[in-house]
Amino acid sequence: VLEPYRHSHPLVDALLMWRKDERIATTYGYRWLDEHVGGDDRLRGAWTACDGAAGRMTAQNGLHNLPAQLRPAICAEPGHVFVRADLGQIEPRVLAVVSGDRAFAEATRSDDLYAPVAARLGSDRPTAKVAVLAAMYGQRSGAAGEALAQLERAYPVAMGLLDRAYADGVAGRSVRTYGGRLIRLGRTPPEPSGSSEPGSAAPEASAATGAESWAVGGADAARGRYARNAIIQGSAAELFKAWAATVRAGVAPVGGQIVLCLHDELLVHVPEAHAAEAAAAVETALQSASRLWAGTGQVRFVADTSIIRRWSEAKE
């Protein structure tokens, strides 16, 4: 309510800042520290390996939703650093694997998938990005609708898979991830609550679809969008787990340990003397894990990898 008036008076801005800080202090204050941070100053939480239709890993006690203001407190032990790796444009690259669209797979050879897609569509990069994300997450109106028509002509195989998934969802038929995990839908539209549900853990998706409601188009449309999301994000979760398991084995010889899995991001704690080796192992693990999961090397997966001392140093 007050946000539109933030700059109208210094008191309004101060009040809004206080409310934000007070919310963080209430949620992550002394009680939270006493309950969840141990005597060794480490935060631990129970993990769920396959949560919701997307099958993502989730964790309790704030591990998956720690505010940015607290991330400077997540620091490596003396003599150690973090190797932080974040998968880039993971959902569209997964779509290339799941659909078997060779033209779309060719676009993944680029570090920035949206650039070759834009060239093929004859549009600019922002429009191409909106079109790809809208195809996966449901927006069909406005600028996205016009760009989608171009996308369907350019990549009919990939778009065909999404259309079939949508039709299965509308009909209440179950769908499967690329790895074969069954996702039951039924006739009742699922509720998109919880950070592990399809569409809620993909920051790029929210940028493309805005505030689109699950109620748009009714229950049938909700099931259709859900099925489409579940296949892509569920398959992406499978790849991420294969990557994490491969990284775990790869960094063990140099004393590295995975300390956090967050959406598409890994944080590896490693002795500083072996940081470069661990970073290389993380990159190598992505290539081997993606080939094993996809059964092909035609689709390229990329990760932004950096060596940092505090989690807050990671590039957003």
Q: What is the predicted role of each segment?
A:
Residues 1-316:
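Conserved catalytic core of nucleotide polymerization and phosphodiester-bond processing enzymes
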